[in-house]
UniProtKB/Swiss-Prot annotation:
The keyword Amino-acid biosynthesis does not apply. GO terms for biological process: cell differentiation. Keywords: Developmental protein, DNA-binding, Homeobox, Nucleus. It comes from Girardia tigrina. This is Homeobox protein DTH-1.
Amino acid sequence: MSSNGDSVKYDTNFDREGYSTDSSNECPNQIDDPLNGIPNSQNSENFQLYSRNNNANELHETFPTTIPIAQQVHLSSFRNSGMVNSNSRSIGPDGSIYSIQPFDRALLQRNFIPNDEMTSNMSFVQMLNSANYDQIEPAFYQNMPGIGNSFMMQSILNPNPNDQEIDNPISDNSTYVLVQGDSNIPTNPQSNPINPTYVSLDLNDCRSNMFEYPSQTGHQYPDINGNGPRLLHCKQELSYPQTNISPFDYRLSRSMQSNTPLSSYKLSLPEIKTISNDWIKGSQNVNFNQNQLLRSTNVSDYTLIKNLPQNLPNPNQTDSIYSSSINENNQPIRNYDSPNPDREDDSEIHENPNPHDTSSVENNDNENSSSGDIGKKRKRRVLFSKKQILELERHFRQKKYLSAPEREHLANLIGLSPTQVKIWFQNHRYKMKRAHHEKALEMGNLAVNRRLNQSMFNDSKSHLPGNFELGINNSFYNSNLALGNLSLNPAVNLMGRIPGMSSMLPTYPNGSQSYFNNINQATLTGSNSSWGV
């Protein structure tokens, strides 16, 4: 125990059996135990703490305290037993921050009553920042044995997890029981206390302990290891669950066992207010909001699991842009209903031209086994009735892409599954795109052929005589042949005007210039005198 002014610091160090690890015959100085005196009835209105030294008058009404939570806690904050007025000051009538849990060993024959938040396993240990205690007024049931002569029970309950830091999560229903003191012998305020009983909690093995101090006339400074108080483990198992909180979920991978100490964890006690008989009768649990928790990093005996939040799709969300399915290997497949033809589902759904023919469902498993691909099976074709096809086509003309609710509505309307409707729309969009593509190719081919024919026709016309009346331009002929001013014979001119006679005109190949140059010039001159050179 270290004392500084009006403060006391507890650095207790007990083994799992609840006894001091110091082998000396007296309690070590760093251990604070109120064994140096029991306050009498004249001090009944004051909550008193007595240190280990011989100064019985050393009083600490407020003190910052640090307690090893995983070790035996002897926070013997107590006062003498005795009856007090039932009109004592109450704790938390306005919703105080603490839950004080009294007990009555004389009536209930047990020394501890756990809170409802306690379960069977201890899953996480945390730390509180230091705080000061106010003095605690005693509270007793009127005309009954004294209960809660001195007791403190701290419930770490955080109703607003969003206020806490990410690295310092706390449970929203964890409960840490530190100390409960009791007097099992009813006395009046004027009598001397006799064998007051105190209860502490051995967080090392998650069991509460009861020990009795001798009377004031006995050992004034008893030895914890020898003639001092005898520790008795109660049968009530305690635990402190850690529940899921946001933004992260921390929990230990295995429970706290009785032989697994966590000596590295420490707990500082926040402020405690006064209690009274009225509050004890009316409530057993009062929540408080403690946002300043520090988590120890020494968890070598455990595996700390940190579950990060994952933004996974909600399978129940009807307006999702995709639907999930399971393939033959139990692996999820996402079928996107998007205009991208590369993501089209390869399932086959075919139309049945005969709505009354239901026997035409094709299942060619035997044919596939004989074709060489034994491991591959052809998918069963789904045949639609004429009524279903008409309804599907009508909706397709209205809307090329259906949302999930629209698919489900249409499927219920025509007696199909939403997947069948989706695949039909995918196949129909693919067929429409393919038809448009083929039509575009066909139109392109026609345009190309038209341009080729026009080019060939223009090339053939360019080899005719200059004044051949076909309404064409003879500049190509005049510029390339360079034959001078050739005038056609009237007979030749007439041949171009008479139907059926134009086929008798000479036809020139592509190399018309070389071909024409090879013609005998004399032949041209002699054949018709009207041709001039």
